[in-house]
């Protein structure tokens, strides 16, 4: 009966499944297993291909490394990144804040690029939002961490924001998907993904032991559905409908920025990167001084690593006709997940031991 109910719900909500559906977390240093602040974004977007690139410092701006959509040759819209000063920023779209204006929309990437150029701290980011021309053209939960203890979300619409500091809540961390707690009650999206994330990490949240590995290797590869109460990656079904899991057909990256606790250590920031559809990707550590070439765009504007992962993703969603693209081939994906998790955990261990 439960399987039948789940199937009917999935069919009824197919259109909703196409909404951009990022899942994220801001973790203060005291809630982190490494004692360093964390910024996580599991990204969902209609732009299937993306890359990571460096922007050098200028006379009036900091240098930074960020995630971009393929085709963004001007590096105009940063979708997550960190700068030379130990500041990092990301966003999730929010669907229950004030309506967009008719004039300016989808400016979140521009705002984040500007923040990476100008901001050292969460307070700097607040000041930036205060001074930007209004309307800002954003409807977002911006997450930031810095090298001075800042870790916060800014639930932001065209004309203002509400700030939530992770260090001021009992757990020391905050989760956001595609609704804002300051917005319209029970509106927006991502309530099940929000619950998925919290349940998958319940023990570690309670213990204050969240790590980058837990976010990329457990949550971003999990097909746990909190409403149904099971993880479909652990089952035997071949075909599973893609709805309300953290990883989705629209997922294009999962990134954890592991920050630092002092500006003197800004060079030690690590951006743990699953580029492309996360269940099919292998982790790549990025530092300010070392951006692996496979993540950067080549002559065609695409990252070789992202293209490799997108090819694997196509095998996980092999049906093209009708509603076929909504079905995951779990027989293909289960061994891929297991192998990529094993390889990624080895990379985490090697980097933490040897710095590479």
Model-inferred region functions:
Residues 84-85, 116-122:
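A short, structured loop/turn motif at beta-sheet edges
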Residues 17-21:
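Boundary at the C-terminal end of the N-terminal hydrophobic targeting segment
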Residues 8-15:
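Bacterial N-terminal signal peptides
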Residues 23-75, 80-81, 91-117, 140, ...:
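C-terminal, well-structured catalytic/ligand-binding subdomain of enzymes
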Residues 1-5:
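Positively charged n-region of N-terminal signal peptides that target proteins for export
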Residues 121-130, 234-240:
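Charged, amphipathic alpha-helical segments
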Residues 127-143:
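Secretory/export targeting leaders with adjacent low-complexity proregions
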Residues 86, 125, 255:
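A residue-level signal for conserved active-site and pocket-lining positions in enzyme catalytic cores
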